[in-house]
Each structure stands twice: as C-alpha cells, then as structure tokens.
Amino acid sequence: MTVNAMPDDRELALAPLDEKVDHVRGSQAGHLIIEYGDYECPYSRQAFRAIELVERQLGGNLRFAFRHFPLTGIHPHALAAAAAAEAAAVQGRFWDLHELLFHRQKALQDSDLRGYAAQLGLDVAAFDRDRAGRSVADRIRRDVDSGLASG
C-alpha cells in the first residue's frame, strides 16, 4: 500500500496566488514558480539554489512564491524553521530569513533560530511570540493544505 496514493477521481488544484498572503517576489509580468518547501529538506535546498540561479539568469522576468511544506515526520526542525520564517515575515524580513535558513540548513535548533532573528535585527521577543502564535500556525497549515490539494 502506498501512503501517498490518491484516488484517480480526485481533482487536483493549485491554490491561486494571493498577494496578501503568499510570499512573492519578482515581476508581475515574469514567469511564475511556486515552490512548496521544507527548510530542513536537502531537495528543497537544491531547489532554492536552482531558483537563485534562474532568478539571476532571468532578472526581472521571474516571479517566485514560496509556500511551506514541512515534512515533520523526517525533518524534526522543519516546522520550527517555517514558524521562524513566518515570524520574520511579521516584521517584514521573510525573504532575508528564508535565505538564511537554507544557507544554514544544518543549524535549525531553537537557539539558532533566535540567533538568526537577532542577526537580522528583529525584535526577538516579538519574534518568539509570533512564531508560537496561532496566526503563524494557521499560515503554515494553509500552505500545507494547499500543497496536499495540489498533489
């Protein structure tokens, strides 16, 4: 039995981009890449590097969105890292922490995450509050649900 098998009649749909909710960068006129990623996953890190390369090559012709998909069964720090990225987003620094998390993928302990927040000049007390809060958990759940619905 395959755990991830889906019935043949299940309709798959990618949730449309929501500029008010999704983390999006790049030109509105550019090609769109939506990544569902996990900060602790080596394959997500490979995708991160590939997207960096494509962004450099296409310049203003790429639009990129990142959605969380922490694989908590195999990556014990993935959910905490996603929550940290969302807490950084509250302070307007999502993309900065996003990049830092992938560059330092082997260092995702709580003390590391707090250190990254301080390094970026975030209000660490607010960062801690936000990453433990309901809205951050709901945001991550929304992304995971969207990823599951997308197949």
Language-model-detected regions and their locations in the chain:
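Extracytoplasmic thiol/disulfide redox context detector
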Residues: 1-73, 136-151
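Structural alpha/beta surface segment adjacent to cysteine/selenocysteine redox centers
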Residues: 32-119, 123, 128
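Metal-dependent phosphoesterase signature
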Residues: 125-137
